[in-house]
Amino acid sequence: MQVLHVCSEMFPLLKTGGLADVIGALPAAQIADGVDARVLLPAFPDIRRGVTDAQVVSRRDTFAGHITLLFGHYNGVGIYLIDAPHLYDRPGSPYHDTNLFAYTDNVLRFALLGWVGAEMASGLDPFWRPDVVHAHDWHAGLAPAYLAARGRPAKSVFTVHNLAYQGMFYAHHMNDIQLPWSFFNIHGLEFNGQISFLKAGLYYADHITAVSPTYAREITEPQFAYGMEGLLQQRHREGRLSGVLNGVDEKIWSPETDLLLASRYTRDTLEDKAENKSQLQIAMGLKVDDKVPLFAVVSRLTSQKGLDLVLEALPGLLEQGGQLALLGAGDPVLQEGFLAAAAEYPGQVGVQIGYHEAFSHRIMGGADVILVPSRFEPCGLTQLYGLKYGTLPLVRRTGGLADTVSDCSLENLADGVASGFVFEDSNAWSLLRAIRRAFVLWSRPSLWRFVQRQAMAMDFSWQVAAKSYRELYYRLK
């Protein structure tokens, strides 16, 4: 079984979001599971530099100009690169310029990505041809459409990492991207009078996956579907929509081997976690005290992530004696709010604006509770890292958060399945009730330790996801 992942970023070469983490880990897990998985990426500068052994496979003149297809390896995974400097050799973000305006030729840049993905199934590399083209998010959404236009030389899977990003372009670009005008149709890639790369993936793929079972259900509902609910409800009825949970890359995220921690630990040596907490308290300007629960946030600061609720609930958290350490950037209003809280509550609130991968490990290793109060969350990786590190997740019941964290209710504690704290409604009062439950559990150290050990024993490895995808691919054949 030969599978080509078509996508726009891959950790650690280039990362703007969780998609990169998936592509950085899933193909390697699939190879270990017996699937010949490779990855197709645009040759953005950071990616091109990282694949040092790239060799020329093919040269083509395309609707988007001349391209060279390269093939090399990264961390044992075969990587195809679309080398088109006029499209991809730009500094900074792969999607927008330094003023945060989307590149005006994005329609060509990402249509080309889908086109090359489909061409791979038609023999662009004469020595390797995929049985399944697995496209990810809107950037790769045209790959299933180009496959459909070619009579489907391979099966296709389209994975929705976040339905909010739709890749919308003016209709006249149909003249530029070498797809039949008949595809510009409500039963096709047309959406509200425009081309939607996302809808192309949803409509033309043989199967759609979302990054958690709950998110797969949620995106059939109007409040989560961004206008795609009719199509997604139809795919659900046809059995062509399912959810596969993302995993944790245990080579990078494991408290037992994490060199970024002051003190490494396992579920059997949880007392060694305390050193990480005191080091984190020092680094964040908090009072060093192992008796108070340290809550943490590692997130983009947006209302989607529910960080306004944290700001609103913060006085209640601090009144009960807790501390907050926050690492993140985003909405200027939220940034200012958290910085003001740090100034108002010195020693209790520590804030670092920005994102530093290394420091996020130190927070995960040192905090007691990781807050993930998202309004929606397709899968979420932060809560999985929390479980792995014995840093109990406090989450809202949505998307992948609902699938991965079990509340410390009396029933769940008795049944041995409790792993964190879960609240229902997206408001500060509901969040504060969950925070209160965290304080109650914290007051019983042996029970807290029991839940930590339970959380750390859960298996969210990529091997589980790789097996689910392999079974899906074989069902499509």
From Swiss-Prot:
Keyword Ribosomal protein: no
Ligand binding (ADP-alpha-D-glucose): K15
Pfam families, alphabetized: Glyco_transf_5, Glycos_transf_1
One MF annotation (Gene Ontology) recorded for this entry: alpha-1,4-glucan glucosyltransferase (ADP-glucose donor) activity
SUPFAM superfamilies: UDP-Glycosyltransferase/glycogen phosphorylase
Name of the top EC class for this enzyme: transferase
Disulfide bond entries: none
Top-level taxon of origin: Bacteria
Keyword check for Glycosyltransferase: yes
Keywords: Glycogen biosynthesis, Glycosyltransferase, Transferase
GO biological process: glycogen biosynthetic process
Pathway the protein contributes to: Glycan biosynthesis; glycogen biosynthesis
EC number: 2.4.1.21
InterPro entries reported for this sequence: Glyco_trans_1, GS/SS, Starch_synth_cat_dom
Chemical reaction(s) catalysed: [(1->4)-alpha-D-glucosyl](n) + ADP-alpha-D-glucose = [(1->4)-alpha-D-glucosyl](n+1) + ADP + H(+)
Annotated GO CC locations: cytosol
Function, in words: Synthesizes alpha-1,4-glucan chains using ADP-glucose.
HAMAP family to which the protein is assigned, alphabetical: Glycogen_synth (MF_00484)
Family: Belongs to the glycosyltransferase 1 family. Bacterial/plant glycogen synthase subfamily.
Record NCBIfam families: glgA, PRK00654.1-2
Stated name of the protein: Glycogen synthase
Organism for this UniProt entry: Shigella flexneri serotype 5b (strain 8401)
Gene name of this polypeptide: glgA
